[in-house]
Each structure stands twice: as C-alpha cells, then as structure tokens.
C-alpha cells in the first residue's frame, strides 16, 4: 500500500471514532493502515473492510516505527489512560522522524478553555492539554479535533436498550 493513512485506535470503542474514520477513508478510496492493540473480531472486521491492519503499542518505539513508516498522514486517538501523555509524545517523536505531513489529534473539548495558568482538576483533561502542548512544540503539522459528545457509541447502546424497552412495553 503506497502512503496509507494511519488510524490509531482503529478498533477502539470510545465513540467508535477510529473505526468510523477508517470506514470513511476507505469509502473515499484511500489506503488505510489501521492500528489495533490485538487481533480479534474488531481487527478482522477492519481487514474485511479493506484496511491494512497492524498490531502496535503506542508506548513501544520499535512498534511505532513499524506502524508509522510509510505514512504521510495520521489520525491519532487513544482511550483515556494514565499513559496518554507518554503515548502522545512517543508517537509524535516517531511521526516526526518519519516525516509525517499531517497529524490529526483527537483531543477533548475542555482543552480549549485551559492555559498554563488555568487548568482543571480532571487528570485526563490535564493530560490532553499537556499532550496538545507537546504536539504543538513537536514541529509536526498538527490539527487538534476537540469533540463535545460522541454519539456513535450511544447509538449502539441505545438501540439495544430501545429493543428491550419495546419488548417490555409490548408485553413480550
């Protein structure tokens, strides 16, 4: 695959962002390298869609060199974790080394309201703010996406709740 677009967290469940981005890019005819943490039914589904699936670890430099090599654009997203900042810096360093030309970072809405003198009590929000600062300093061409609400996961969970509610309401 020539110059695939890398999507980290492609099998993730946080708003199904990685999976949705992968699907949309593939529908546009783009070559996609979908990074996952492990092989499972979600990675098989990505492969069935046409993505090049690679197993990687955001905290492992060797792993990230293998995952990022040959990609000029990447969508970076990961689940909430104490290692979020370390993973972001690790990935940014490897992306810079490989000459990534566009780094799209999935951040959080609250980051836009923070500064060096005004932060929040939330450790996750602070990690996202610090990660954005590190990406800005990295020299990479970065775009920060700060969603307010993820409805994709809600839709999946809500549909099963609605089916149960309808079943109960109909006396079934």
Predicted regions and their residues:
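Hydrophobic acceptor-binding patch used for acceptor engagement in glycosyltransferases
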Residues: 74
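Short, conserved active-site loop motifs that form the nucleotide-linked donor/cofactor pocket
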Residues: 50-52, 142
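Extended, polar beta-sheet/loop recognition surfaces of beta-rich domains
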Residues: 90
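Oxidoreductase cofactor-interface core, primarily capturing Rossmann-like NAD(P)-dependent enzymes
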Residues: 1-45, 59-62, 66-71, 80-83, ...
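Cofactor-binding loops of NAD(P)H-dependent oxidoreductases
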Residues: 56
């Amino acid at each position: 695959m020539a110059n695939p677009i890398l999507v980290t967290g492609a099998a993730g469940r946080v708003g199904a962002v990685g999976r949705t981005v992968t699907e949309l890019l593939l529908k546009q005819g783009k070559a996609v390298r979908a990074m996952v943490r492990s092989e499972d039914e979600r990675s098989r589904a990505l492969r069935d869609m046409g993505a090049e699936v690679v197993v990687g670890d955001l905290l492992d430099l060797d792993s990230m060199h293998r995952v990022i090599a040959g990609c000029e654009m990447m969508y970076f997203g990961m689940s909430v974790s104490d290692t979020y900042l370390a993973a972001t810096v690790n990935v940014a360093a490897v992306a810079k080394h490989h000459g990534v030309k566009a780094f799209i970072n999935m951040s959080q809405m609250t980051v836009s309201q923070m500064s060096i003198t005004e932060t929040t009590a939330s450790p996750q929000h602070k990690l996202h703010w610090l990660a954005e600062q590190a990406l800005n300093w990295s020299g990479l061409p970065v775009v920060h996406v700060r969603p307010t609400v993820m409805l994709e996961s809600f839709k999946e969970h809500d549909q099963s709740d609605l089916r149960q509610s309808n079943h109960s309401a109909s006396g079934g």
